[in-house]
Amino acid sequence: MAVSFAHFLIQTLNGIVSGMILALVASGLTLIFGIMDVVNFAHGEFLMLGAYVGVVTLALTGSFWLALVAAALVIAVFGAIVYLTTLRPLLGRDPLTTILATFGVSLVLQNYALWQFGPVARKIEEPFSGQFTLFYLDYPWYRLIIAALAAAIIGGLWLFLKFGTYGIWIRATTQDRVMAQAMGIPVPWVLTGVFAIGSAMAAASGVLFAPLVGVDHAMGVNWILKTFIVVVVGGMGNLGGSIAAAIFISLLEAYSSLWVSPAQAVIVSFVVLIMTLLFRPTGLFAPTPK
């Protein structure tokens, strides 16, 4: 089936938009794993709860941007509490214990959201409703704006890690936790802050993407599987690799949907995952070991 250039360009934009949101989610998960060696199965539920905080804040204030900030702050604090009460006592033990703990947290949060908000999906209205014409097809401005916002948040994270004092502490903790603590860096609070930052990024992703898909108690499950695929393909703990993998996989799915249904196009990401595990288990976008 022939595909017009206009449709190809639209799918390219769709892939980039989805890829940037996925990169934002994956960045938080990668940050947590790269520094703490914790596989957080509850990460998708932080996205879901962030979206619900956005729904409530938007209903109270009418401001989408206030809802975005409130979701990030509330879930950052909530993530820190979850870490301190559930994960911190398990650090240093068998990694399976933290996996089971985060999986349990995920189930609890899903069922809490179902009990509190019900099974009916909620809606967050787009702050921008305009469209522009690309060739003869209309494309929403909001999709481009959320891609730009996601890129700005990821860029801010990179600058924070590169130049901020707390970011330097985080990088020092990643390289040698014992030496960092010996130099006076408060490693336990650095780890708490890292988990809070990762949770906030998931919450921001939930609010940004909610106008496109709606908000329900199971939305985190849909995201966490794809996020783990991105993290593995990009290289476990590799922030830049996760961003590249998110855009790469989203573009592949977008292009595949030109010929097959979107439900079938999802298979592409699993094919990439299997090929990565078979031929380059360190990740497609991970630096080649010297």
How should these model regions be labeled?
Residues M1-H7, V82, L87-L91, P281-K290:
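Transmembrane alpha-helical segments of polytopic membrane transport and secretion proteins
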Residues M1-L24, V53, T61-A67, R93-T98, ...:
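Membrane-interfacial amphipathic/re-entrant helices at transmembrane-helix boundaries
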Residues H7, V25, Q116, Q175-A182, ...:
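Cytosolic-side transmembrane-helix boundaries in multi-pass membrane proteins
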Residues L13, I35-I81, T85, W259:
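Membrane-embedded helix boundary and interhelical linker motif in transport proteins
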Residues S18-G19, L24, D138-D216, L239-A244:
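Helix-loop-helix "hairpin" substructures at the membrane interface of multi-pass membrane proteins
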Residues L22, A26, G62-L73, T192-A202, ...:
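Transmembrane alpha-helical segments in multi-pass inner-membrane proteins
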Residues G62-V105, Y112, A244-I249, R280-P281:
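Alpha-helical transmembrane segments within multi-pass membrane transporters and channels
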Residues P89-F163, V190-G193, Y255, V260-A263, ...:
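Transmembrane helix-bundle core of multi-pass membrane transporters
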